[in-house]
Amino acid sequence: MSGNNSSLSYKDAGVDIDAGNALVDRIKGAVKRTRRPEVMGGIGGFGALCELPTKYKQPVLVSGTDGVGTKLRLALDMNKHDTIGVDLVAMCVNDLIVQGAEPLFFLDYYATGKLDVDTAADVVSGIADGCVQAGCALIGGETAEMPGMYEGEDYDVAGFCVGVVEKEDVIDGTKVAAGDALIAVGSSGPHSNGYSLIRKILEVSGADKNEELAGRTIGEHLLEPTKIYIKSALKMIEKHDIHAISHITGGGFWENIPRVLLEGTKAVIDGNSWEWPIIFKWLQEKGNVETHEMYRTFNCGVGLVVALPKDQADAAVALLKEEGENAWVIGEIAQAEANEEQVEIQ
């Protein structure tokens, strides 16, 4: 036995159970405001229960998981944590809507070296805000305090979401055809992708995050939360024959649009159909980033690209605008030759 007779505790090892309990008490109100009628029970159980909505005849569950990448580093540097949870929810639920799914419930994982209750409560409050926007319930989560794994009060977050769609209404891209119109739905900024390049641009250029750009600081532009498209997109899906939806995330246009296209088709994008939001122009200028690389890394102002019959495009754009979205016709689907790139930006 060791010569040290003092009694050790979990807290001595760097894990504060009392802080964890305090966090649970703090977030109960936030969780409650996300509740859906299908949710059974409250938080704190070993598992969370949720019934399927009764309106579905042949329900298909759609799942997704994601994080927010190195946008977290920016939030930590700026000590602003109340919207990063919105980003987390958005990155998950926007992937579900691509297949026509209505988000049902969401769970989060929060890992840190030393739990700061105020910071964690801000993050969870943001998650609840995102769930309210998406119409899904925050039904559970995990907070892991792991001394030695993370530096100080640094943290990481991950999210997991489950949605539901009628089997016959699954959007899988199989209806995409040459002649379809492509609609863009505007983004709120870089969303949660490309932040390693953004941080490199800030470092190399020596730019000040407090510098003003179009009435806001650079930092405010960069921490603008990811737009959640669920409610407007569900209305569009209800009214129109949607052939495919692409969520423009990591990999930009070149990587994400081909994921929903059939072999032998390509997306022809009119690069003059919209003006990049000013933050993307600033990033390109400060980082001397080539235009192709911008489209490969960032959404450049486009959060979703939607394929649908050409004769429905104008009505769909009008509906999206009524729902508060910035939407426009951005291009069309065309036939592609063998081995031809599936995205062409003119």
From Swiss-Prot:
The keyword ATP-binding applies. It catalyses: 2-formamido-N(1)-(5-O-phospho-beta-D-ribosyl)acetamidine + ATP = 5-amino-1-(5-phospho-beta-D-ribosyl)imidazole + ADP + phosphate + H(+). Keywords: ATP-binding, Cytoplasm, Ligase, Nucleotide-binding, Purine biosynthesis. GO terms for biological process: 'de novo' IMP biosynthetic process; adenine biosynthetic process. GO terms for molecular function: ATP binding; phosphoribosylamine-glycine ligase activity; phosphoribosylformylglycinamidine cyclo-ligase activity. It holds the Pfam family AIRS_C. Pathway: Purine metabolism; IMP biosynthesis via de novo pathway; 5-amino-1-(5-phospho-D-ribosyl)imidazole from N(2)-formyl-N(1)-(5-phospho-D-ribosyl)glycinamide: step 2/2. It is found in: Cytoplasm. Disulfide bonds: none annotated. One of its GO terms (cellular component) is cytosol. It comes from the Bacteria. Its EC number is 6.3.3.1. It is an enzyme of class 6 (ligase). NCBIfam families: purM. Belongs to the AIR synthase family. This is Phosphoribosylformylglycinamidine cyclo-ligase. It comes from Vibrio campbellii (strain ATCC BAA-1116).
